[in-house]
Curated annotation (Swiss-Prot):
Belongs to the MnmG family. This is tRNA uridine 5-carboxymethylaminomethyl modification enzyme MnmG. It is found in: Cytoplasm. GO terms for molecular function: flavin adenine dinucleotide binding. Homodimer. Heterotetramer of two MnmE and two MnmG subunits. Keywords: Cytoplasm, FAD, Flavoprotein, NAD, tRNA processing. FAD binds at G13, G14, G15, H16, A17, G18. NAD-binding protein involved in the addition of a carboxymethylaminomethyl (cmnm) group at the wobble position (U34) of certain tRNAs, forming tRNA-cmnm(5)s(2)U34. NAD(+) binds at residues 272-286. Its main location: cytoplasm. Transmembrane segments: none annotated. Gene3D superfamilies: FAD/NAD(P)-binding domain, GidA associated domain, C-terminal subdomain, tRNA uridine 5-carboxymethylaminomethyl modification enzyme MnmG/GidA. Its cofactor is FAD.
Length: 624
């Protein structure tokens, strides 16, 4: 798309959130600009070279279900695929892929380049243009101005980014790239109170100097399981990763120098991610352990750089050089680049509506680390939702809210806008109350129809989705129609309750010890079912009774979510306590359900709100 001076939507930042936001907006038909320093940095993996994992893999599948980019790009760049928790139930399994950094970035850049309605504008966004309380454009550092109907800010760690390496500090968005200073000032001028968060990265190692024979080797799954339903097979060559551990000697080096770590010297005062601690934090907090696991992850097929996952650190460079040889396999390793920590600005996510539009400024949307999250996948999911809603806002359409029963992206956004954060937010399956239905394997069944209705899913995905649903429905109909008595089942080696009742092939697969292969051996007509469809059918059967039970909880949840509070003046709602009024006014919840998730909100206050909404609805109906 040719560069213009006016767009429907402008997305600032070309990271994981920005790419999804820009592509989603463009798929919605909005003329979109992606503003980034350099096209060459689009899709860069700033930290670990991996996509997915526990909870995170669910988000990637949900992004894919809404025709997002991350799943397909990870499939193109993935060099080791593994499903985590494979021995556990499907609801908590997490697809993950080790990626080749160059292949991943190239695939993302290609996807952005090929997206209709999307232009990439190289430059630094320096200020927001605001007219009558609404964002109407942006100013670039080189003096250019771009007009628009909505802006999505996805700046990652660039907002007043400050790198820490031992006692040294310098401004940067990531190593080798300048921070974004103007946007922080612009957000503060609007009235946002910016907080500070911290993240870190480990040193990079020369893989040719690692003693691979001294470490455990880990292979990927064979065959590899793709992220995207549109990917038939993984064609990229696959690699092994190594596993080693820190030692007592490693811990001694760290303890002797921990006072030089910015986290412990007082140099860094912001909070880092709880579930991705630095190696010095591990030694201080878990000093009784004799070792901590390290995954040696190659960064590419033609790149000898290795990412040592598990030793993120901001200790001085000379200390990092001293601790590495104490680790088995790394005795003679060459450090290519030291690890470091980075602090950056973020906005309190309670300043956001569930659409990811800010409450204090119409037309302004935020996604990714600026909202207090950590991780590529969390950023991508937010970017997609923000991009869809920015396009809807620019076009005058009604916003879309994904709730906690829709998917992990709904869980994450609700957690952020309702509860806020005290540390970088990471997705886990344990955060979802409806995780039996929010599985990685059924993301398309949950979300693709919504995407089609919105207009962000089209083309080949629509045709594929409809064929898949039709095949699954047909397979379920066949499996439900085939029945057997307990006596007949016994002839096939199955032990069932001798109650005389006939059970279908679908019902039999609900038993833990009975899989699709077993029922197929009883009924040869099931052999015609596609293996992928058969896997979905078996999982649906295993969870069927629990899903039907959970659907009652979802219905009750959705009734509360259907009671929209809007812009209520809580000062005029009779019966509310002063404490409840203060909490509601500060949080500005979207629905009764969201109000109920505010810390300290009482059932009595919720009852008063529900009664008030009913009275207002009757009054408005009578007036009309």
């Amino acid at each position: 798309m040719t560069e213009h001076t006016s767009y429907d939507v402008i997305v600032i930042g070309g990271g994981h959130a920005g790419c999804e936001a820009a592509a989603a907006s463009a798929r919605m038909g909005a003329r979109t600009a992606l503003v980034t320093h350099r096209f060459a940095t689009i899709g860069a993996m700033s930290c670990n070279p991996a996509i997915g994992g526990l909870g995170k893999g669910h988000l990637v599948r949900e992004v894919d279900a809404l025709d997002g980019l991350m799943g397909r790009v990870a499939d193109a760049g993935g060099i080791q695929f593994r499903v985590l928790n494979r021995r556990k139930g499907p609801a908590v399994r997490g697809p993950r892929a080790q990626a080749d950094r160059k292949l991943y970035a190239a695939a993302m850049q290609s996807a952005i380049r090929e997206t209709t309605n999307l232009a990439v504008v190289e430059g630094e966004a320096d200020d927001l243009i605001v007219v009558d309380g609404r964002v109407t454009g942006i100013k670039l550092a080189d003096g250019r101005s771009l007009a628009c109907g909505a802006v999505v800010i996805t700046t990652g760690t660039f907002l007043r980014g400050l790198i820490h390496l031992g006692e040294k500090t310098w401004p940067a968005g990531r190593v080798g790239e300048a921070p974004a200073l103007g946007l922080s000032r612009s957000l503060e001028a609007i009235g946002f109170n910016l907080g500070r968060l911290k993240t870190g990265t480990p040193p990079r190692l020369d893989g040719t100097t690692i003693d691979w024979g001294a470490v455990e080797m880990q292979t990927g799954d064979d065959p590899a399981e793709p992220f995207s339903v549109l990917t038939e097979t993984i064609t990229t060559p696959q690699i092994q990763c190594g596993i080693t551990r820190t030692t007592i000697a490693t811990h001694e080096v760290i303890r002797a120098n921990v006072h030089r770590s910015p986290m412990y010297s007082g140099q860094i005062k912001s909070t880092g991610p709880r579930y991705c601690p630095s190696v010095e934090d591990k030694i201080v907090r878990f000093g009784d352990r004799d070792g901590h696991q390290i995954f040696l992850e190659p960064e590419g097929l033609d790149d000898s750089t290795v990412y040592p996952n598990g030793i993120s650190t901001s200790l001085p460079e000379e200390v990092q050089l001293a601790l590495l040889p104490t680790i088995p396999g790394l005795e003679r390793v060459r450090m290519i680049r030291p690890g470091y920590a980075i602090e950056y600005d973020h906005v309190d996510p309670r300043e956001l509506e569930p659409t990811l539009q800010t409450k204090r400024m119409k037309g302004l949307f935020l996604a990714g680390q600026i909202n207090g999250t950590t991780g590529y996948e969390e950023a991508a999911a937010q970017g997609l939702v923000a991009g869809i809603n920015a396009a809807l806002a620019a076009g005058g359409g009604a916003p879309i809210v994904f709730d906690r029963a829709d998917g992990y992206l709904g869980v994450m956004i609700d957690d952020l806008v309702t509860r806020g954060i005290t540390e970088p937010y990471r997705m886990f399956t344990s955060r979802a109350e409806y995780r039996l239905t929010l599985r990685a394997d059924n993301a398309d069944q949950r979300l693709t129809d919504k995407g089609i209705a919105l207009g962000c899913v089209g083309g080949e995905r629509v045709r594929f989705h409809r064929r898949k649903l039709a095949a699954l429905q047909a397979a379920r109909a066949v499996a439900t129609s085939l029945t057997i008595t307990p006596n007949e089942a016994a002839k096939h080696g199955l032990t069932l309750n001798r109650d005389g009742q006939r059970r279908s092939a679908f019902e039999l697969m609900a038993y833990p010890e009975i899989d699709f292969a077993k029922v197929r051996s009883i009924w040869p007509e099931l052999e015609a079912i596609d293996p992928v469809v058969a896997t979905h059918l078996e999982i649906d059967a295993k969870y069927d009774v629990y899903v039907r039970r959970q659907s009652e909880d979802v219905d009750a949840f959705r009734r509360d979510e259907g009671l929209v509070l809007g812009d209520i003046d809580y000062a005029i709602v009779p019966g509310l306590s002063n404490e409840a009024r203060a909490k509601l006014t500060a949080a500005k919840p979207w629905t009764i359900g969201q109000a109920g998730r505010i810390d300290g909100m009482t059932p009595a206050a919720l009852g008063i709100l529900a009664a008030y909404l009913r009275r207002e609805a009757r009054r408005n109906k009578a007036a009309s």
